[in-house]
Amino acid sequence: NTVKPHFIKGGKLERMYPAYDAFETFLFVPDHTTQKGSHIRDAIDLKRTMITVLIALMPALLFGMWNVGQLHFIAIGESFTLMKAFTYGALKMLPLIAISYGVGLSIEFTFAISRGHSVNEGYLVTGMLIPMIMPIDVPLWMLVVSVIFAVIIGKEVFGGTGMNILNPALTARAFLFFAYPSFMSGDKVWINTDNGTVVNGFSGATPLADLAANIPVDMSLIGSFFLGNIPGSIGETSTFAILLGAVILIFTGIGSWRTMLSVFIGGYIMSLLFNLWGINELMLLPAHLHLILGGFAF
């Protein structure tokens, strides 16, 4: 390797070593291991673990791209094929992903170089999660601001991966929700119409938004709720696709089925408690439906 000597201690590009190390360990298995302290030997490192999580996100991401397209064409009353819907959704989604990774990794590299430590691997997943929990119509400049806020305030001020007390992806969403609520809620932000005319009778409200307005849920749509072809954030509408990702995490040993099951049990029990003294449609919603609505599974 004729390049590495320039980046190691004493080389003319020594300060840029964290950036070099990030690319090297992403492409190749690291040639160094821990030397002291308690540690566990494993066949994969943290970057490979994060890549596995990214693979587990693919079912929800790909379905979300298709769902964005099919809701768009339904809203404007235009016929479509599976590929036409997917292509439209992918073209709308890719700029969000590019901005999330571009802005976030730039900040990560800046902090790593200034502090002289390795680039944290956690953003490989965070960079994908942020656009997946956003409305498809979120302005790109807002996404930039939310990513900057999430990475700096939600992560780097605490020391980086493993030391942050806030979830960076949820921090980005919470920031936009409180700073620009009109762009993060309502019945118009979840479906991209390219400013076209919406057909009569079409509503872009999410099922939970209808329930919050005391509109009973249509029980004939339970199948759609589970499959996910309903309005909502890009990656969180399809419980089916999310469960496919969970299977990948469990099969590879990255995720614990006990942890996942406990979350669903806890959510189900809490929903039953609300059912006991339900005073509105949202609290009266059957407990099992809470598990497939509102991005709970995601």
Question: Which stretches of residues belong to each language-model region?
Answer:
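N-terminal signal-anchor module of multipass membrane proteins
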Residues: N1-I97, Y101
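C-terminal ends of transmembrane helices
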Residues: T34-I40, G104-G116, I152-G162, L244-G253, ...
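Hydrophobic alpha-helical transmembrane segments
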Residues: M50, L54, L94-A98, E121-V125, ...
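Structural signature of hydrophobic alpha-helical transmembrane segments
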Residues: F86-G102, D137-S146, N229-T239, L282-L293
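Active-site cofactor/substrate anionic-group-binding motifs, chiefly glycine-
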Residues: G89-Y123, M132, E156
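Membrane-interface helix-loop-helix junctions at boundaries between adjacent transmembrane segments
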Residues: S118-V198
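Long hydrophobic alpha-helical segments that form multi-pass transmembrane helix bundles
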Residues: G162-L243
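Alpha-helical transmembrane segments
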Residues: T252-F298
